[in-house]
Every structure is written in structure tokens, then in C-alpha cells.
Amino acid sequence: MVKKFIDKLRGVERDVIQAPDEGDAPFYAVQAGEADFFEAAYSQRLPVMLKGPTGCGKTRFLEHMAHKLGRPLVTVSCHEDLTSSDLVGRFLLQGEETVWQDGPLTKAVKEGAICYLDEIVEARTDTTVVIHPLTDHRRQLPLDKKGQIIDAHEDFML
């Protein structure tokens, strides 16, 4: 199932998709119970925001936890030019048809991945507003361009 999910995500620009491999977890030295905190948040389907200076280990921690929980990790590098369409998806021309292509956030929501919005503070407010319904009790992603609302997979985590 994870391989099928990873295959669906191939070709997404600006994103890194990592499947949990069957070997050892990526090395991470737990400092102060953050792994237990993360697991508790995951079990309650609560979003987590990691804050710290560049190079302090946020990405490595998420790689470690995704492996430990057996979930794929979708990493989106946020920046000031990132649009909500870059996150949720867009309509594209394919031959003479117009087709919808899910963005990395939509794919993660549908398939139950852990989605890491790296450097989210760099993204514009009009882009980040799309994640608000995912961070509360609704756990939903509105796809305004399609007129749909996607309920998050039970294993999805932001």
C-alpha cells in the first residue's frame, strides 16, 4: 500500500516523498521526550508544529518518527512564492482534456501520510489559510476549485 501511495506522488515538484523502509529508523537522539509527545499527538490525530533554528534536527526528527510509525512522509518546502494550488492541486491541460492533478497536501490527506510543511512561516497567509480546517476537529481539506471537501484519512498527520 505504501508503494502504491509513493507511486501516486511521483513527479510532484518541490516535494520529497519518503516511504518508510524496513531497515533501521533514521538516527535521531531523543532530547526531552519529544518522541513520546509526537506519538501522543499522532494517536489523538492532533497537528504538531516544530520550531527551532535551521539545522537543529526538525526534518531528521520527522523522518525518524515517520519510520517509527510506519507512515510515508511528504515534505513540502514552503517559500514566499508557494501558492495554495501548489499544495492542494490544480487543473491541467492534458491533450484536449482538462484534468485535475492533486497536490502533495491533498495526496497526503487522502492516503494518510505525515505531511511536513517545512519553513511554513515563509509561505504567504493566503496560501497557509488552506490548512486551517485540517488543524481543528474537522480534519478536512477544501478543494475550492473542484467544489469538494476531502475528509482526512485517519492516519493523516500535519
Write out the residue ranges for each language-model feature.
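AAA+ P-loop NTPase catalytic core and its hallmark functional loops
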Residues: 1-158
